[in-house]
Amino acid sequence: MTRDGAYDLFERELEAVRRRYGFVVAGYVLMPEHVHLLVGEPRRSPLSVALQVLKQQSSRKLKSSGEAQFWQRRYYDFNVHNGEKRVEKLRYMHRNPVQRGLVEKPEEWPWSSFQHYATGKIGTIEIESEWTARRREAETVQQLRLPPFARS
């Protein structure tokens, strides 16, 4: 499996685990040897359980495809309590591929939430942001405009 294929697989696994455990992903960046995640506490279990499942499922699938170990043994967490700190962490994460010399600009790194924040682009992973809130609001308004028998 190519590195791109491994990143794609991980994005699909992250979205599946996000849905299963009901947590918000505010941002992410996949790097060659680690992952940055900015997430909210899951509704259905502790974050440590959701991350353990994510690591196990993605590792098993990557290993079966011949990909080398992806995860570090431990994860490091940092609590974000306000919007200012959230923006700081997102900037740090999105700039990481640039700092490492992988790309010249954050928008050139395809395995991150940067494009979502820059353009509102919907990717594999649902990112919780103002773009997402506006899209949900527009979908709700559209549903309310439909005749009752046409609503799903």
Where are these regions (language model features)?
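Short catalytic/metal-binding and nucleic-acid-binding patches
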Residues: M1-S152
